[in-house]
Amino acid sequence: MAAAALNGLKMAATSQAYLESMPVNDTRKLLSDLCRHFYGLGWVSGTGGSITIKVHDESIPKPQQLIVMSPSGVQKERMVPEDMYVLSPSGCFLSSPSPKPYPNKPPKCSDCAPLFMKAYLMRNAGAVIHSHGMESCIVTMIDPLSKEFRITHMEMIKGIQGHGYYDELVVPIIENTAHERELTDALAEAIEAYPKTTAVLVRNHGIYIWGDSWIHAKTQAECYHYLFDAAIKLYQLGLDWSTPDHGPIKKYGGKTNMSVKAGTVNSNHETEPSRRCIVLDIEGTTTPISFVTDVLFPFARNNVSRHLAATYETDETQDDIKLLRTQVQSDLEQGIVGAVPIPPDDAGKEEVIAALVANVEAMIKADRKITALKQLQGHIWRTGFQNNELEGVVFEDVPEALQKWHASGIKVYIYSSGSRLAQRLLFGYTNYGDLRKYLCGFFDTTVGNKRETKSYVEITESVGVDKPSEILFVTDVYQEAVAAKAAGLEVIISIRPGNGPLPDNHGFKTITSFSDI
């Protein structure tokens, strides 16, 4: 009965009569009014930028509400209600504007449509704004290597959902592409990686901002642009907007902390390498190996059945199952010990889950570094961290070192066999609080095996250095050290309690604490 009622609701909401109803027409008019207003602010000039709003109707659940969207490549200040597109909740066109005479171009829906849909689907947004405001573009250029914009202790931060005056506002930055639609995957990854954010900056381009309603989205957009403008002005004054006191930007080697740190002189008066980036391993480097083997792995193993049963119908878990099926089929063909066939979907949920659990337990027992396992483990751990069943552990010297490197303008990345999601969780929920603010990015085995030189070549090409020697890689595994050195990276081996032995005469510098770096 409930399904039938929902289907009836969907049909009624997409009927021609409803498309001509007051809620839809009011939303069309509101959108055209906002286009003119935002044009005056410089957010949608030169036909750039776009806006979309869901048709608010108390009788229709938000996920089923229709979507009104502005067109692309048009003069936003001249928009009228009839120029707007109306889309279904899934993004199908229900109503399109009529062509206008020359010199107007044929109507075309916003190129931002796929990105707007991500905000609707992933954040249940009520409205999304894409601005080309000058301040949202320039603020991404101040530090070309930064993956985030950060600001704190500014009154207007209070206008951003979930933030107060004393909080640090963090906005992810993704790289621009030649075509708007090519940003879709990067935007989705940023939304997933930053669950608290209500905006994503696009370098040298602009910003996407969403809210529960058009008022909420508009209010936040005004606050974001104010904060970006403030950061730019503070930077021009030589003041640091990212610190509570907004004091002078610190300088290292004649450069500000917005730049990279120059080579330093050690206690023997020898010039050490100029490090622009530090790439850190996790197990045995930032975190005790025992935490992974004694806490994380058992948690995943003990909760895999519960997790699969509770989330079986979700798209995320179905993707996990698809990856596991592919991996298990390969394992069976290669005769991998512990691999058992997974029944087809029509065999029943319980049978499929039982086979999946058997395979996952065998993979964990063998400590296999494979994407299918790591991805599922990450999703299980996410639930544990969010429910306070898990807390990440790092060595006591790690937070201070990360803070020091961050202040020095050195970019710090993580490279681990664990999934990027698992890495973000570990550093986001540590015994020292959220340390992700000191990290610029995460690499996992999708970039390559950690014992292969080409993986470190790929990382070198991804972090924006001029040469591999500007990267310091810290690991506890000799084979990884050899591979990184072969790629031209500077390498240090971490000696921590519980780490495995190293070969005699291995030839690498070693440390027992990050304070030694």
Curated annotation (Swiss-Prot):
<feature type="binding site">
    <location>
        <begin position="416"/>
        <end position="417"/>
    </location>
    <ligand>
        <name>substrate 2</name>
    </ligand>
</feature>
<protein>
    <recommendedName>
        <fullName>Probable bifunctional methylthioribulose-1-phosphate dehydratase/enolase-phosphatase E1 1</fullName>
        <ecNumber>4.2.1.109</ecNumber>
        <ecNumber>3.1.3.77</ecNumber>
    </recommendedName>
</protein>
<keyword id="KW-0460">Magnesium</keyword>
<keyword id="KW-0862">Zinc</keyword>
<feature type="binding site">
    <location>
        <position position="205"/>
    </location>
    <ligand>
        <name>Zn(2+)</name>
    </ligand>
</feature>
<feature type="binding site">
    <location>
        <position position="130"/>
    </location>
    <ligand>
        <name>Zn(2+)</name>
    </ligand>
</feature>
<dbReference type="InterPro" id="IPR006439">
    <property type="entry name" value="HAD-SF_hydro_IA"/>
</dbReference>
<keyword id="KW-0511">Multifunctional enzyme</keyword>
<dbReference type="InterPro" id="IPR023214">
    <property type="entry name" value="HAD_sf"/>
</dbReference>
<dbReference type="InterPro" id="IPR027511">
    <property type="entry name" value="ENOPH1_eukaryotes"/>
</dbReference>
<keyword id="KW-0378">Hydrolase</keyword>
<dbReference type="InterPro" id="IPR027505">
    <property type="entry name" value="MtnB_viridiplantae"/>
</dbReference>
<dbReference type="GO" id="GO:0000287">
    <property type="term" value="F:magnesium ion binding"/>
</dbReference>
<feature type="binding site">
    <location>
        <position position="450"/>
    </location>
    <ligand>
        <name>substrate 2</name>
    </ligand>
</feature>
<comment type="pathway">
    <text>Amino-acid biosynthesis; L-methionine biosynthesis via salvage pathway; L-methionine from S-methyl-5-thio-alpha-D-ribose 1-phosphate: step 2/6.</text>
</comment>
<dbReference type="InterPro" id="IPR001303">
    <property type="entry name" value="Aldolase_II/adducin_N"/>
</dbReference>
<keyword id="KW-0486">Methionine biosynthesis</keyword>
<dbReference type="InterPro" id="IPR027514">
    <property type="entry name" value="Salvage_MtnB_euk"/>
</dbReference>
<dbReference type="InterPro" id="IPR017714">
    <property type="entry name" value="MethylthioRu-1-P_deHdtase_MtnB"/>
</dbReference>
<dbReference type="GO" id="GO:0008270">
    <property type="term" value="F:zinc ion binding"/>
</dbReference>
<keyword id="KW-0456">Lyase</keyword>
<feature type="binding site">
    <location>
        <position position="281"/>
    </location>
    <ligand>
        <name>Mg(2+)</name>
    </ligand>
</feature>
<feature type="binding site">
    <location>
        <position position="132"/>
    </location>
    <ligand>
        <name>Zn(2+)</name>
    </ligand>
</feature>
<feature type="binding site">
    <location>
        <position position="476"/>
    </location>
    <ligand>
        <name>Mg(2+)</name>
    </ligand>
</feature>
<dbReference type="Pfam" id="PF00596">
    <property type="entry name" value="Aldolase_II"/>
</dbReference>
<dbReference type="Pfam" id="PF00702">
    <property type="entry name" value="Hydrolase"/>
</dbReference>
<feature type="binding site">
    <location>
        <position position="112"/>
    </location>
    <ligand>
        <name>substrate 1</name>
    </ligand>
</feature>
<comment type="pathway">
    <text>Amino-acid biosynthesis; L-methionine biosynthesis via salvage pathway; L-methionine from S-methyl-5-thio-alpha-D-ribose 1-phosphate: step 3/6.</text>
</comment>
<dbReference type="GO" id="GO:0046570">
    <property type="term" value="F:methylthioribulose 1-phosphate dehydratase activity"/>
</dbReference>
<dbReference type="GO" id="GO:0005737">
    <property type="term" value="C:cytoplasm"/>
</dbReference>
<feature type="region of interest" description="Enolase-phosphatase E1">
    <location>
        <begin position="278"/>
        <end position="517"/>
    </location>
</feature>
<dbReference type="InterPro" id="IPR023943">
    <property type="entry name" value="Enolase-ppase_E1"/>
</dbReference>
<dbReference type="GO" id="GO:0043874">
    <property type="term" value="F:acireductone synthase activity"/>
</dbReference>
<dbReference type="GO" id="GO:0019509">
    <property type="term" value="P:L-methionine salvage from methylthioadenosine"/>
</dbReference>
<keyword id="KW-0028">Amino-acid biosynthesis</keyword>
<feature type="active site" description="Proton donor/acceptor; for methylthioribulose-1-phosphate dehydratase activity">
    <location>
        <position position="155"/>
    </location>
</feature>
<keyword id="KW-0479">Metal-binding</keyword>
<dbReference type="InterPro" id="IPR036409">
    <property type="entry name" value="Aldolase_II/adducin_N_sf"/>
</dbReference>
<feature type="binding site">
    <location>
        <position position="283"/>
    </location>
    <ligand>
        <name>Mg(2+)</name>
    </ligand>
</feature>
<comment type="similarity">
    <text>In the N-terminal section; belongs to the aldolase class II family. MtnB subfamily.</text>
</comment>
<comment type="similarity">
    <text>In the C-terminal section; belongs to the HAD-like hydrolase superfamily. MasA/MtnC family.</text>
</comment>
<dbReference type="InterPro" id="IPR036412">
    <property type="entry name" value="HAD-like_sf"/>
</dbReference>
